[in-house]
Amino acid sequence: ARLGQGVLLNLNALVCHDCEVGDFVEISPGAILTGACSVGDFSFIGSGAVLKPGVTVGKHAIVAAGAVVTEDVPDNAMVAGVPAKLKKSV
């Protein structure tokens, strides 16, 4: 895994093999980034969220607490739910 500058990795958060996390990303408590995930700069991963293998989260994106991300998240998007769906652009 590679963590960028200024990443906030909270309690019990898990970043698995081959993940790339950009600069100034917040990964909330209990979030799980499974293998080969990518998170863009200035993004937020909510508590208990799960990113499935190979998922890419764009820059300035928000993943809500408890979301299960099974598809790529575009830049400047907010996703929520199980499975995660686009809720709005930010």
Range-by-range predicted roles:
Residues 1-80, 84-87:
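Structural signal for interior beta-strand "rungs" in well-ordered beta-sheet cores
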